[in-house]
Design a protein with these regions (language model features):
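Intrinsically disordered, low-complexity terminal tails and inter-domain linkers enriched
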Residues: 8-27, 304-316, 377-425
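Functionally critical mobile loop/hinge segments
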Residues: 83, 471-548
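Alpha-helical support elements that line or immediately flank enzyme active sites
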Residues: 54-69, 365-377, 424, 471-478
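Accessory "access/gating" subregions that flank catalytic or transport cores
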Residues: 251-379, 420-453, 457
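Conserved phosphate/anionic-ligand binding catalytic regions in large, soluble enzymes, centered on
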Residues: 45-65, 349-367, 458-467
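Structured, active/binding-site neighborhoods that engage oxygen-rich ligands
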Residues: 2-19, 30-42, 57-60, 65, ...
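C-terminal regulatory domains involved in ligand/effector binding and gene-expression control
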Residues: 109-321, 334
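Contiguous, well-ordered alpha-helical segments that form the cores/surfaces of helical PPI scaffolds
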Residues: 61, 337, 341, 362-372, ...
């Protein structure tokens, strides 16, 4: 394995103050109506590691940017990291220190392997040496050189960090201040005035490509989005696709949508196969695997024995509240499972999709999982014993629904998923429509309010994810633009006031369960909207403004 996969000339740290970028739009540095192109699906959904997009992914990108800029300069003898404000307050619980160090070592949150993530702090603790991508080893004490400064809040943003590299005489070689503004987006300070900072945004290898290319259907509000759909005759998903394909070839867009969906499905399956206690000191046990096993066996009760021949439960302690194989509410159990699995993976610091944040990473995969396993529009067969196909004995509930890397005929004989290339392609199309419609809603929230829990509370994280998921599901089930907007509005409206209140600063309690609740809320919001005609009293724009 290449320990430092990021080449020193990778242009991940280039920035141009005159060029609009997603980070500049998200941070409010550039007004949404001044941006020629709405935020892209490449901006809204990004692969990274847990547990926080603003406190883990963003700082890791900052560390990578710093080490890349440092590469052509004289080798440093000392590096210090100062974590200010919210990063200082919850940085230990959110693994901010580990994230910055991973970035400085040359790792990207999208590609770093989990073994490296888990080994870097023990390695530093034993050696007190940080190896830069160039191979230079720099003495670094985690206790002394990574400083948490929660009571100092820098003027530009509550999530700030400063990295300083100096020579053996203490002369500064390079010093940079970064601001993690939410969703993994990062701004860099370009002047030395601490009271009046000037900032620009970091570019990345994917996000921001074409943000300054005029979109064929620009929109900066929900009203403008609906007007653009009316004028063009396009659905919200089709309109977003047209904007995407003005910048990138269709094949590139589709490949990215496939990758995002498959990473979500893989995360669900990883969470359902993992056991143990989540890190951080709260001793929170993983629950997804046990729940997956019960649902896969079609249990009729919480502790029901099964027969080897049929896998069906024989109830010995059945209770009225226990969902059975004939209970239509059983679908909710699967949705809960999907969300719990993803957020347990996130809490463990493993691979997730930022959607739109890591703290809310379980909502959209849970609703997407519901779409592909319980909705007949995607070829699933709801009804008695409805749920993912687990007749091969696996408790990885989405292992047969990946969009890529799975031959169509690889599903078990008799499975409702063994339905040929045409059905597979239809399912893929609906998944793409889901993600594209969710992108539109997420872009509106990001540009007109905030998705950072440190700024607006959990209403901006889980609330936004619920709105995006509701819109995506309504779109995939055939909703009109007005119904899709209504679904997002319902989910967002009934998330207003939700605070960011993690116990001990960990993205575990109440965050993991909260994702499950928000996923079910999103499904209900979509169904309510689809039973209506799209007309409603409070607009999505008003709800977003209220949240801000």
């Amino acid at each position: 394995m290449d320990l430092h996969p990021v080449a020193l000339d990778t242009p991940v740290t280039t920035y141009d103050p005159s060029r609009p970028t997603p980070a500049a739009i998200v941070s409010g540095h550039i007004a949404a109506h001044d941006a020629p192109h709405p935020l892209s699906v490449f901006d809204m959904f990004r692969i990274g590691i847990g547990p926080s997009s603003s406190h883990t992914v963003g700082p890791m990108r900052a560390g990578l940017a710093f080490t890349t800029e440092l590469a052509p300069l004289p080798p440093p003898s000392h590096i210090t990291i100062d974590l200010f404000g919210s990063l200082g307050a919850t940085g230990r619980g959110h693994s901010t220190d580990r994230a910055v160090l991973l970035g400085l070592a040359g790792y990207d949150p999208e590609t770093v392997d989990i073994e490296t993530v888990e080994s870097i702090l023990p390695s530093l603790a034993s050696s007190s040496m940080l190896t830069l991508p160039s191979g230079t080893q720099v003495p670094l004490s985690i206790a002394e050189d990574v400083r948490f400064v929660p009571r100092t809040v820098l003027p530009y943003h509550v999530n700030a960090l400063t990295i300083t590299a100096s020579d053996k005489d203490g002369t500064v070689i390079l010093e940079r201040t970064y601001y993690s503004v939410g969703g993994g987006f990062v701004m860099i300070q370009t002047n030395d005035d601490p009271h009046n900072p000037e900032v620009s945004s970091l570019a990345t290898s994917q996000a921001g490509v074409g943000i300054d290319v005029p979109a064929p259907h620009p929109f900066a509000s929900g009203a403008q989005l609906l007007a653009a759909c009316d004028a063009s005759g396009l659905s919200i998903a089709e309109l977003v696709r047209h904007n995407e394909e003005a910048v990138r070839p269709r094949e590139t867009v589709n490949a990215y949508l496939d990758r995002i969906a498959d990473t979500m499905f893989d995360c669900v399956d990883a969470g359902t196969s993992a056991t143990g206690i989540l890190p951080g000191g709260l001793d929170v046990p993983r629950r997804a695997r046990a729940l997956a096993g019960k649902l896969a066996r079609r249990l009729l009760g919480p502790s029901t024995p099964t027969t080897a021949e049929t896998g069906q439960g024989v109830p010995d302690d059945a209770r009225a509240w226990v969902s059975t194989a004939t209970d239509p509410m059983r679908a909710m159990d699967w949705v809960n499972l999907f969300a719990l699995a993803v957020n347990e993976e996130n809490a463990a610091g493993h691979r997730v999709v930022t959607a739109p944040t890591n703290g809310a990473a379980g909502v959209i995969p849970a609703v997407l999982g519901y779409l592909v396993t319980h909705c007949p529009e995607t070829g699933s067969t709801p009804g008695i014993a409805a749920g993912p196909d687990t007749r091969d004995g696996s408790i990885a509930p989405l292992s047969h629904i990946r969009l890529t890397g799975r031959p169509v005929d690889s599903t078990p004989e008799g499975s409702e998923l063994a339905d040929g290339a045409a059905a597979h392609e239809h399912r893929r199309t609906l998944v793409h429509e889901f993600l594209l419609a969710a992108t539109a809603i997420g872009a509106l929230i990001k540009t007109n309010a905030s998705i950072a829990g440190a700024e607006v509370g959990c209403q901006g994280e889980v609330g936004s994810a619920s709105a995006m998921a509701a819109a995506g599901l309504a779109q995939a089930l055939g909703g009109s633009p007005q119904q899709v907007e209504n679904a997002a509005e319902i989910a967002m409206e009934h998330s207003l006031g939700l605070t960011c209140d993690p116990v001990a600063g960990l993205v575990q309690v109440p965050c993991i369960e909260r994702n499950a609740i928000a996923a079910v809320k999103a499904i209900n919001a979509a169904r309510m909207a689809l039973w209506g005609d799209g007309r409603h009293t409070v607009s999505l724009d008003v709800v977003i403004e209220t949240m801000r």
